[in-house]
């Protein structure tokens, strides 16, 4: 919590960059997702000033135009977090991301990362986890239907099946596609399905404990 406070304290040497280049949008998206997933541990204990500084910082990122691929979800999940905490929201960023990701579904649990399909781990790094988390909030706010949320979850479950089958008996997995060095996120959809306790019946949670982390 002290680190989070320092992250938006102008006088702290640990103050995060929210103003230079596009990268802060990516970083802020994962931070916003963490706030969504663990509000009682990470968001609610923060003091009022720190919360307001994060809200201001997140809103300042609206100036950045996202790349036309999975990056649409970065802006969308930031706005979704703002919606969750009762702030004014740029709905267009949320709806555009959801619309395009849905259009880019190619079947069998896989989304295309933009108009052209790329065989890589971005379905795990970004697409499934963020889309499901976004739909969870939109469902709570009655902006999307239960059916839309459930469809996204079912697709993530199907993708987790592919992910589990790529893990070798010794815990290694094939490195392919761009950003293969982001190995800690290579099975995020699989771990999220395990966390939600909706793994396919033939995948036992204990089998995942020895998977790469």
Feature annotation, model-predicted:
Residues 160:
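Glycine-rich phosphate/ribose-binding loops and adjacent secondary-structure elements
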